[in-house]
């Protein structure tokens, strides 16, 4: 028995087979509990059995190989979360904490040397990209945050995978790396819904995190441009609708005992995010097109308004279904009073029953991407990178943002068919720096002077609030191009910088929201 390998480590455990018996060893009470709960995982009991309604499937026995051995101990000494939601069962929270191999349930923010607190505060839908959790926490760990990790959440049920990823990294920092986040997500989905469903769910939910990474549903109060790049608004909605259509055949692969978990963690978030996007963006389009004096006769504005109104009615019905599931077990968790965007959409004028009937079957229109006079690419398609550069899966609008270490750089080349004024737009992802350093990057075009910009988070800055909601900080560098080959160099100066996308735009005053990257470049 490997007692000597765990006895000097806090919260460690070992599981082995001795004389035909399964043996669990713990270095302390926590370690023993973690070991026993590890056995329950091996038997198919999810840590989310109660919080996620992941009903355990019946098994007749648990068998381990005669040479089975696992020895585990934590990478971070104190691991846990702050649950700020109302009416949460403290006993159930402590059970979940143990099942996630945590040892700290805080009621106030973490503080002190070696401590790191991360905000995963969604109160409605899960919208923090998995790559964001990995990037922020791994960077903090590398900078010395190894004593205490705390996730600030509202309700653990809402952010089940995010909290699982956070706690898994705190337990063993090597579980996840920059490129295997999708594999970790697949393993988690398999634990909840089975491998067959997980195989089909992974691409669907990866695209879900792509779309919510472009804009969080609870912040869908932004203008997408119908006249930008071949109608970025309709393409965004069409991508959402494709996800919704993919859910029905997958649901049939989920065991009946897990159907409530599938609805709460997959069906509801995807559909609700889609309906919120349709509701908000089509209402915006109706207001943009229509005028109060002519709204009742404006078929284009009416079509957008009816699509928005229909989505709103469907969203209300979906919320009622969520609140009523399992005899209202989770009704109190869906408090949407704090969300102004959940209100009825506003149009230039009233909608008649006749208009609703006429345009009720309207859906997203097919629009092909038109990159116009731009050269656009995701940052991961660099020509050259210095040592230490890493592509991070499931992060950014590209879902492949690039981490550039201090002093490191990315280089790109392009050929300009046009000459004259242009702007180089660089989309970075601002991460809070654990050590409090400034977060600066420089952008140099050809042999010109490097433009140095800070992308450090500043909660008091309106520009930062816009960037936080967008998920990107846009750095613009004015250039005067010749018809020739050109080079762009992006360098991190103080701390790691995450670069997402870049664009050479020959229309410096262009209004748009989404960088026009083709599907082949994703």
How would you name each of these model-derived features?
Residues 1-73:
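Contiguous, structured surface segment used for ligand recognition
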Residues 2-7, 88-90, 95-115, 179, ...:
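Ser/Thr/Asn(+Pro)-rich, low-complexity disordered segments
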Residues 21-23, 78-80, 95-96, 102-104, ...:
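Beta-sheet entry/capping signal
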Residues 23-26, 82-87, 103-107, 117-131:
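The substrate-binding groove and active-site-proximal loops of carbohydrate-active enzymes
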Residues 27-29, 86, 102, 107-114, ...:
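An acidic- and aromatic-residue-enriched active-site/binding cleft used to recognize and process polar
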Residues 48-109:
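An acidic-aromatic substrate-binding cleft motif
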Residues 111-385, 485:
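Substrate-binding groove of N-acetylhexosamine-processing glycoside hydrolases
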Residues 347-522:
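Extracytoplasmic
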